[in-house]
Amino acid sequence: DAIKNDYPELRIIIASPQGITFNHNKAVELSREERRLVFLCGHYEGIDERVRLGFGAEEISIGDYILTGGELPAMVIIDAAVRLIPGVLGDEDSARHDSFADFILDYPQYTRPPDYKGMNVPEVLLSGNHEEIRKWRRMQAIKNTYYKRPDLLEKMKLTDEDKKILNEVKKKA
């Protein structure tokens, strides 16, 4: 009761396998929350039901598996939300272009050297042609999503270019 009296504008979240499944949209919602967020983390047996009911806490799950406590799920939720707050990341474009920001997986990443044990960086990435690099990256991202997480394609807002790419990927499948 003291907490409710001192901080009436709290949003209380319990990391729980009984909650709604956490996703990028929930991270965006939490990143824009103006109230203070409080995460309650049970350990082994969870949290007394009266706490959930008394505080009107919402439950959020990070997946269908069991951990020893709610600390790790709370950290996952916090990290995913905080990185979306302007000014937190050094590069504002990072959060916008990461996987799931628009329901598409990322394209493959390459670093130096250009040849590692016979595995080469794709020529297009070494070409310096920014438009071709952009097209290659988009093609690879759509291809990754199609093969690894096709469920995300249903949520994606496909441009005309994306639709053409997806059709090409499907033909080659």
Task: Go through the PLM ranges and name each one.
Residues 47, 51-98:
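Structured adenosyl-cofactor binding patch, chiefly the S-adenosyl-L-methionine
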Residues 72, 84-123:
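Internal, active-site/partner-interface "lid" segment
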Residues 2, 76, 80, 135:
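Alpha-helical scaffold segments in soluble metabolic enzymes
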Residues 114-173:
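SAM-dependent methyltransferases
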Residues 24-26, 50-52, 108:
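Short, well-ordered secondary-structure micro-motifs
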